[in-house]
Amino acid sequence: MLTLRSACQLTTKNLGLHKCISKTVISALGRRGYHSENYETSKISGKKALILENALEHVPQLGFTEDAIVQGGQALGYSNLSKALFPSGPMDLISYFFLKQRYALSSLKPHLTTIPETSGRVVQLIWSRLQGNRDIVQHLPQMIAICTYPSNLRKSLSSLAELSDEILYLAQDKSADFQWYTKRAAISAIYSASELFMSRDTSPNFEATYNFVQHRIQHAKALNDLRNDVLEWGSFQLNAVRSILRSRGI
């Protein structure tokens, strides 16, 4: 639950949050990653994966909450273990959701071969990942708020970095290392901004969100002029938190 104290910490002008984001971005986004085919089958397995998989079925109704995790455990007969197994609570459920949605992008490989330009493939990948939010779109503001808590920021940035890795790999980007790092951070910025936009989108089939993604990629000049998108990343995160706090009357 968002407390007044955490709200004050999150809304302390730009200085505190941007310092925190800057340090964490360097750590989370500063290493060249790998496609999920090179990762272990899953970072979450066994009993935990079963509980979280069941918990996701309750997210459309309950949101990313401890109640959803408890319901997921109870369906498997683990009525007393759910909270003990997931010390980060809702963030553990969100991380599993991110992981599952990222892995699903590999199914686009055949379609991506029909798109000639890298920028077009990136648009398709970002849009497809956003489509994974359809069933839980009403809970996106809650999810964004949880991800932006200081205690969860490193984990959420790590998930975002892995998503950017996946998108660049599947888009068959062949950049040299320095340019690749810039693109990775920029895709993280564009995806974060698009997800925030989607949380407010009331257009049919989220058409406005799709147009927003296209515009951001075009604005980046086919992924060659990305500095502004990188610099705007922190501002989008800060605005997301402020919007959520305002909606809750804090």
Swiss-Prot record:
The keyword Mitochondrion applies. It comes from the Eukaryota. A 1,2-diacylglycero-3-phosphoethanolamine binds at Y181, T182, K183, R184. GO terms for molecular function: lipid binding. Pathway: Cofactor biosynthesis; ubiquinone biosynthesis. Signal peptide: none annotated. Its main location: mitochondrion. Belongs to the COQ9 family. Keywords: Lipid-binding, Mitochondrion, Transit peptide, Ubiquinone biosynthesis. It holds the Pfam family COQ9. One of its GO terms (biological process) is ubiquinone biosynthetic process. It is found in: Mitochondrion. This is Ubiquinone biosynthesis protein coq9, mitochondrial. Membrane-associated protein that warps the membrane surface to access and bind aromatic isoprenes with high specificity, including ubiquinone (CoQ) isoprene intermediates and presents them directly to coq7, therefore facilitating the coq7-mediated hydroxylase step. Participates in the biosynthesis of coenzyme Q, also named ubiquinone, an essential lipid-soluble electron transporter for aerobic cellular respiration. Gene3D superfamilies: Tetracycline Repressor, domain 2. GO terms for cellular component: mitochondrial inner membrane; mitochondrion. Coiled coil: none annotated.
